[in-house]
Design a protein with these regions (language model features):
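Surface-exposed, charge/polar-rich loops and edge strands
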Residues: 90
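Short acidic/histidine-rich active-site segments
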Residues: 94-108
């Protein structure tokens, strides 16, 4: 979790507010993300040769802990895109997994999602155009709905990923850097002391 947080922090610092940016070298560093699993979400508009190069790059660096994500949203091109992904998986040895790119808990929140997108773009919803999702399928779908969209093997891969994830939020503890807390203080007593000093200076 700490390594992942460090990578996210770096991604935020190298981009403008509200954006993230990572270079390939950031992902390739040996000391980062070695305990993390990765979903490679290919861009449908890219040519197959580019997708293959990207997939091979990810496979080389995350072998045994990376999957090719198949996101299907009932937008008319699902079967063609799934076929392309299956070809790519077959030629690169990349395991293919069902993925949802979930943005809302229920389809009924689509209007709110559109408002949030327009707010991010600083425009009216009517002006957001193709920046809005084409439909409300990026929500938490039932297992029955997923079974009607994805081949069983892709859903099986989601269980394999889940079985490898042992992290729990209960494991998180804030760790104060040793150099911040003077020897005679505990982290809590030092924070209290500094807070009172700030109160005295301000008020």
């Amino acid at each position: 979790y700490g390594r992942l947080s460090a990578v996210i922090t770096k991604a935020r610092r190298t981009a403008g507010k509200g954006s993230y940016q990572l270079e390939a070298a950031d992902l390739a560093r040996e000391d980062h993300l070695h305990e993390c699993l990765l979903l490679y979400v290919p861009e449908p508009s890219l040519p197959r040769s580019v997708l293959a190069r990207q997939a091979e790059w990810v496979q080389e660096r995350f072998s045994g802990r990376a999957w090719l994500a198949a996101e299907l949203f009932c937008e008319g091109e699902d079967w063609g895109w799934l076929g392309r992904l299956q070809d790519l998986a077959g030629s690169t040895g990349f395991p293919l997994v069902a993925a949802g790119n979930v943005h809302m808990h229920a389809r009924s929140r689509r209007a709110l999602q559109d408002v949030l997108t327009a707010t991010r773009l600083k425009c009216a919803v009517a002006e957001a155009g193709f920046a809005l999702f084409a439909n409300g399928e990026r929500h938490l779908r039932s297992l029955q709905a997923l079974k009607s969209l994805y081949p069983p093997a892709l859903l099986e891969q989601t269980l394999q990923i889940a079985a490898r994830c042992h992290f729990s939020l209960d494991e998180l503890r804030y760790e104060y850097p040793d150099e911040v807390v003077p020897p005679r203080y505990t982290p809590r007593s030092y924070l209290r002391n500094v807070t009172y000093q700030g109160m005295d200076a301000r008020w």
